[in-house]
From Swiss-Prot:
It comes from Treponema pallidum (strain Nichols). Participates in transcription elongation, termination and antitermination. SUPFAM superfamilies: N-utilization substance G protein NusG, N-terminal domain, Translation proteins SH3-like domain. PROSITE patterns: NUSG. Belongs to the NusG family. One of its GO terms (cellular component) is cytosol. Gene3D superfamilies: 2.30.30.30, NusG, N-terminal domain. Residues 134-163 form the KOW domain. GO terms for biological process: DNA-templated transcription termination; regulation of DNA-templated transcription elongation; transcription antitermination; transcription elongation-coupled chromatin remodeling. Keywords: Transcription, Transcription antitermination, Transcription regulation, Transcription termination. It comes from the Bacteria. This is Transcription termination/antitermination protein NusG. InterPro entries: KOW (IPR005824), NGN (IPR047050), NGN-like_dom (IPR006645), NGN_dom_sf (IPR036735), NusG-like (IPR043425), Rib_uL2_dom2 (IPR014722), Transcrpt_antiterm_NusG (IPR001062), Transcrpt_antiterm_NusG_bac_CS (IPR015869). The gene is nusG.
Length: 185
């Protein structure tokens, strides 16, 4: 067999504890080191704006799931899977009811998940947690138009920007701003 990524289902909020427990199984030789190679909690960076302050936080984008890179043996796969399933907080492997060998995630899907988590090369810029709707009233908190209010005309989420119609001298003027420069009213 070759190394493949599998998805381990856990109780939500127990991901870090389960990750440590799986690493301990390998460290204490309950599972051979040539079977489990890596384990990841799929997280992404988000920029939150709270009380006018920006901060970058880590958020799980698949709560209750871990990615485990394994080379499951053809013969003794049940032993390995049962050891992992015995960990408190583990529900089981995705694609396996317990009697069948777990299904590996396709290489493309694993690459996309790891890329989104920033584990492999790709866009690692923090995503903005705040979203706006067209027509929503906002206040500009940063930049030359700070303290002005306006109405959202367009949301460009892929560029983390928003176009706001600001009334200056009695005329609505469109202004393109970063998402972190505005807050909802």
């Amino acid at each position: 067999m070759a190394k493949e990524w599998y998805i381990l289902h856990t109780f939500s909020g127990r991901e870090a504890r389960v990750e440590r427990a799986v690493r301990m199984l390998v460290e204490h030789a309950r599972i051979p080191t040539n079977v489990i190679f890596d384990i990841k909690i799929p997280e992404e960076l988000l920029t939150e704006v709270k009380d006018g302050k920006k901060r970058v936080v880590r958020r799980k984008f698949f709560p209750g799931y871990l990615l485990v890179e394994m080379d499951l043996p053809e013969v003794d796969w049940r032993i390995v899977c049962n050891e992992v399933r015995r960990i408190p907080g583990v529900s089981g492997f995705l694609g396996s009811s317990g009697n069948a060998k777990p299904q590996a995630v396709s290489a493309d899907e694993a690459r996309r998940i790891l890329q989104k988590a920033g584990e492999i090369k790709g866009d690692r810029t923090p995503r903005i947690a705040q979203t706006f709707l067209v027509g929503q009233q906002v206040r500009i908190v940063e930049g030359p138009f700070a303290t002005f209010s306006g109405e959202v005309e367009e949301v460009m989420s892929e560029r983390n920007k928003v176009r706001v119609a600001v009334t200056i001298f009695g005329r609505a003027t469109p202004v393109e701003l970063e998402l972190v420069q505005v807050e909802a009213l």
